Amino acid sequence: MTDYLVRAIAKSGSVRALACVTTATVGAICKRHDTLPTATAALGRGITAGALMGALLKTGQRVAMRFEGNGPLKKIVIEADANGSVRGYVGDPKVHLLRPDGALDVNNALGRAGFLTVAKDLGLKEPYRGTVQLYTSGIAEDLALYLVESEQIPSAVGIAEFIEQDGTVAAAGGFLIQAVPPVDPLVIEELMTRIEQLPPLSELLHKGGNPEQILEQLLAGIPYDILEKRNIAFACSCSRERIERVLLSMGKKELSSMKKDQHGSEVTCEFCGEHYLFDEADLDRIIAEIAKQEG
């Protein structure tokens, strides 16, 4: 089934909500990075968070999220755009921690101490940046804290996954719900009560639940309109041309040393694993281009 996201708003205008299923996208990205189960769960949560945040953007805008902790996973790096494209990676894909009850321990894998940094490219001169301390290191709660503290929007986030014993991603998805200004405290109280009473999101997803069904449970009793449905998929923006521009920015001296010591350069994209090879002739051409630009 194609992954997709649904965006809705209460008829009163007081609440907006997003829900998505990201099973195939999480599976595809984790397969590229050959992640072990706990790293799969952590990266999967980041991917779902990215899809939700991307859906809050306007066309042409992008968001980057960096969860950095003091655990063995080290970091989760995610990029997403307004069109439903997501990519990401973790610091160590071979991390596999379990709780005493046998559940995947994402919180301690990332580490209890650390930061979430969000950068939004809104088409302005400089990206908007916000940073908060990790709250639980479970991803959903950390993202909600960021939205409340940095963007001043009362928000609740739910993200879940179901990983099989062999590491297969059986289900993944989530929701994001926000109170729309002017905020009504009674609306927030009602939403929090409703969220606390929800059945486990992982169970709903594993049973084949779709975004519409998530919204039905989340907004039960609240009249709402569905504004949009959009597909979600892995996409990487790396290219040989982009990598060449990076090499161009390094300068003649460093490229000349690279040519002498390494007889070329091999660059691997951290997001998709694609390898780009530049031989001595390529470096000579780039060095000549730099000299030409310098006049």
Swiss-Prot record:
NCBIfam families (UniProt xref): PRK00114.1 (NF001033)
Disulfide bond sites: C236-C238, C269-C272
Entry annotated with the keyword Lipid metabolism: no
Function: Redox regulated molecular chaperone. Protects both thermally unfolding and oxidatively damaged proteins from irreversible aggregation. Plays an important role in the bacterial defense system toward oxidative stress.
The species this protein was found in: Citrifermentans bemidjiense (strain ATCC BAA-1014 / DSM 16622 / JCM 12645 / Bem) (Geobacter bemidjiensis)
Gene Ontology molecular functions: protein folding chaperone; unfolded protein binding
Alphabetical list of InterPro entries matching this protein: Heat_shock_Hsp33, Heat_shock_Hsp33_C, Heat_shock_Hsp33_N
Transferase among keywords: no
Name by which UniProt lists this protein: 33 kDa chaperonin
Domain of life: Bacteria
Gene3D superfamilies: Hsp33 domain (3.55.30.10), HSP33 redox switch-like (3.90.1280.10)
Annotated GO biological process: protein refolding
Localisation per UniProt entry: Cytoplasm
Keywords: Chaperone, Cytoplasm, Disulfide bond, Redox-active center, Zinc
GO cellular component: cytoplasm
Classification via HAMAP family: HslO
Modifications the protein undergoes after translation, according to the UniProt entry: Under oxidizing conditions two disulfide bonds are formed involving the reactive cysteines. Under reducing conditions zinc is bound to the reactive cysteines and the protein is inactive.
Major subcellular location class: cytoplasm
